[in-house]
Amino acid sequence: KTIQYARNPLAYDQNWLDRGLIVAGNYANTYPIPITPKWTSYWLRDELLNYGFNEVDTVFYPPLQQGAPYIIPAINEGVGIVNYRGWGDANGWHYPEFHVDDVNDLNNGWLTPVFFSYVCNSNDFANNVDPCLAEAIIRGGTPTVPKGGVAFIGPSDLHTSTKYNNVINAYMYDAMLNYNIVELGPAMQAGQSGLVKEFPAQSGPGEAQEFYANVYNILGDPSLQVYLDTPDEFNFNIQPIYSSERFLDFSVTSSNGDPVPQTVISIMNNGDILSKGNTDLDGRYITTLEFEDLTDIDIYANKSGFVQGHANVVIGDNSSILTLSNIDISTLSGNQLPALSETVNMALTIKNESNAGTDAIQTELVFMGNVLPNLFPIEIPSISPNSSVILPPITFTCYGTNVGESVIGKIQDSDGFTLFTFAIEVEKPVFGIDFIDSGLPSSILNPELLITNYSGGSYDDIKILLTPISEGASVSSNGSSNLTNSFVPFESSTHQTSYDVSLDNVAYGSDITFQIDFEKDGIVFFSQEAIMHIETPAINYPVAPNNYGYWAYDNTDVGFAASPEFSWVELDPQFGGENGTHYQLDDDDHVDIQMPFPFQYHGVNYENITVNSNGWASFVPCDIDYFWNMSIPMYMGPKALLAPFSDDLETIDTNGDGNIDRWINVYSWYDEENGRFVIEWSRALNGYDEITEETFEIILYDQNAMPTETGDGVIDFQYLHINDVDVTKNYSTVGIESPNKNYGLQYVFNNVYSPGAAPL
């Protein structure tokens, strides 16, 4: 199943991979009955359709308890993914029902989807129920007439929780849809890592982070990619390869002719890997292979969104008498691959393949750039029949590469005719670079860097160059220009720079970007950007801006023109308010309101706003009444979010007569004179104890009343009485989030405040 899915998934249906099936059930055998499995599934359906799926079928309980009559035809038609949230065990999904025995009734052939089963016990491969649902799905069918799925992700434990499964579900699809992390292993790990962000307090032994890292498992190949649409196919452009030099040079393009960079390449023969690596930005890959007496090789190409590419290449015989039979590389560090800037010693072996002796030849060895020295006169001496000679060794240094991670060398005769072409693979430099200290506005500092060498390369006598590439900083030499540095493989070390950095009067919370260059022998061989963060020191400074440029100022930010003044606008008539429009909201309820003026938010104009009973609003309409507050940003949830106090707010029946006595009262008012629109949550009960009252409001300003440079409206959050008490449910979330949900400005989450934020 895995091989067919990877190599020829479209053989029987060209369109099945852009269809999906989502199954969900809101059920529990004790109160309360969860409602979020269907919410999560509605959200996922919309995200898949927005991503580009042509069709996403849904089978939900309620209303359907017998799910198999609907699930089986959908899978048989062909779907790329099957996603389940709800109630189940090793026997299968119970609401709606789809059990182990139902797998036998599938007839989907080679259209084998990936199953995502975020529900208890469905992947319990050690259960007395044998096979469990996951095993039945994977084992389904025969090698010639398959059925079921190609892979299955789900937990083995019987006691998983809805709130954690929802997060893992959301974070897995965030990784796959938004960050192109589509291999099963990394995608599942991304889902599990979501618990670290959304439930930071659940970090102890046996708590959620550890527990779900253990119980979620993959049946199937963890390196299998999930096709999220109809995949593209590779085209190969392969230059002839000859046995006299074994130099392989080819490129891969998409079906429309575009280069495909970072394609994972494997060169194989008879199951042995001869070479592996990634294509460069032009989709090109080069290597000199080591083999004897081979007649052909296989090239495999893998990249997300593509069917695995395969090409068989016949090794040609160019009737050359001389062959380049060996390339011997040695380095000062003793590593197999030379690092950039490292001295390399190389000796070539030339073999006479004929039965007659050869004459001496005057040649030149030429490197195609990025190598010093790059030209060597070499004499190939006369060679006896069927004998070899080792040429005198040469010494050089690579400061860059020609194609991918390799440099190209050629041996040419006196007429310029190329006798041999070869490639030398270089260790790719991979560094993490961070400033150790935070800068302060209007200060001068000599920065230290924490540098982590993530590669196997050794680097010695390296100078570090520092250049600002954003406004707000300048650098000057401090006289210690002779400082040199060494970087040991797979280790971190601190390094003093030879520069003084002068910071302007930049804002706290700003990021100043510098270019870090590594230089040796006067040649820069590595460059990378690093950010110096200007840390906010105390609560009386604004919270740093988000990606778009929103800052958060509160009334404790002394000396800033944008700092707001608290001036409560009461709309609830029971407490002296007037003119407000009243919305009586139920538990987990919302109302859509037309705003009195267009409001620009993150560069987009909106005319309506969804106001939710749980202390949040969104400019993009949202019919799902999310009550569990998440961090900002979080892929699942309302889009274009305003969260003045996102938390689970409740209605109650005080006397037990079955009728609600305390509603969630929301009011809105257009203050035309002052160009502002006010939305108040009045004395709403916190779901933590159903006693604590929360009163807060949003004020949106018209551009005519409070203009900004970008045209985006100013947003005020005001708090009359607030108690952030919900200790069992991540307290509250306060902040804003972009319409695309890929960034935001988080003021507080789970009682942890951003630098500069004042406690509510």
Identify the meaning behind each predicted range.
Residues 301-314, 396-431, 500-536:
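Terminal connector regions
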Residues 240-245, 334-342, 437-444:
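Short, solvent-exposed loop/linker segments at the N-terminal edge
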Residues 1-310:
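Cysteine-dependent hydrolase recognition
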Residues 190-193, 203-242, 302-321, 416-424, ...:
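A recurrent domain-boundary module in secreted/ectodomain proteins
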Residues 22, 503-506, 533-760:
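Extracytoplasmic Ser/Thr/Pro-rich, glycosylation-prone low-complexity segments
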Residues 264-270, 351-372, 452-474:
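Short acidic, flexible loop segments centered on an aromatic residue
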Residues 341-355, 442-457:
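Short beta-strand elements of extracellular/lumenal beta-sandwich folds
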Residues 284-285, 372-401, 476-506:
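Intrinsically disordered, low-complexity Pro/Gly/Ser/Thr-rich segments with frequent PxxP/GP/PP motifs
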